[in-house]
Amino acid sequence: MNKSGFLIFCLILLTLSQGVPLSRNTRCSCIEISNGSVNPRSLEKLEVIPASQSCPRVEIIATMKKNGEKRCLNPESKTIKNLLKAINKQRTKRSPRTRKEA
C-alpha cells in the first residue's frame, strides 16, 4: 500500500471511530423506585437525572440528611411532582435580583 492510500485509510478510520463512546456504562442508577413521599426537611440533596442514551428514563435520587441514605423516587408520582414544583418555587424566590446601578 502506498503512502496516500495509507493516509486515506487512517482518515477513514478516524472518522468512523469519532462517535464511539469511551464509557460503556449503559445502566440506570435506580434499580428500585420508591412510590412513597419524602419530607422536604429531611432532604440533604435531590438529583434529577434526565433520560439519556445510557438510561431511557428520568431518575430522581433523594439523599437523606440523617443517614445519607439514597432513595430513588418515582418521577411520575403526583407527590414527587409537587415536591419538585415547591423546590423550584423556593429557588426562584431565593435567586438574587439584579439591581440597576445609578
Swiss-Prot record:
Keyword Secreted: yes
Positions of modified residues (Citrulline): 24
InterPro entries: Chemokine_b/g/d, Chemokine_CXC, Chemokine_CXC_CS, Chemokine_IL8-like_dom, CXC_Chemokine_domain, Interleukin_8-like_sf
GO terms, biological process: adenylate cyclase-activating G protein-coupled receptor signaling pathway; antiviral innate immune response; cellular response to interleukin-17; cellular response to lipopolysaccharide; cellular response to virus; chemokine-mediated signaling pathway; chemotaxis; endothelial cell activation
Keywords, sorted A to Z: Chemotaxis, Citrullination, Cytokine, Disulfide bond, Inflammatory response, Secreted, Signal
Gene Ontology, cellular component aspect: external side of plasma membrane; extracellular space
Localisation per UniProt entry: Secreted
Keyword Signal: yes
SS bond partners: 28-55, 30-72
GO molecular function per UniProt: chemoattractant activity; chemokine activity; CXCR chemokine receptor binding; CXCR3 chemokine receptor binding; heparin binding
Domain of life of the organism encoding this protein: Eukaryota
Signal sequence annotation: 1-19
Entry function: Pro-inflammatory cytokine that is involved in a wide variety of processes such as chemotaxis, differentiation, and activation of peripheral immune cells, regulation of cell growth, apoptosis and modulation of angiostatic effects. Plays thereby an important role during viral infections by stimulating the activation and migration of immune cells to the infected sites.
Family stated for the protein in its record: Belongs to the intercrine alpha (chemokine CxC) family.
Subunit-level organization: Monomer, dimer, and tetramer. Interacts with CXCR3 (via N-terminus).
Protein name as catalogued: C-X-C motif chemokine 10
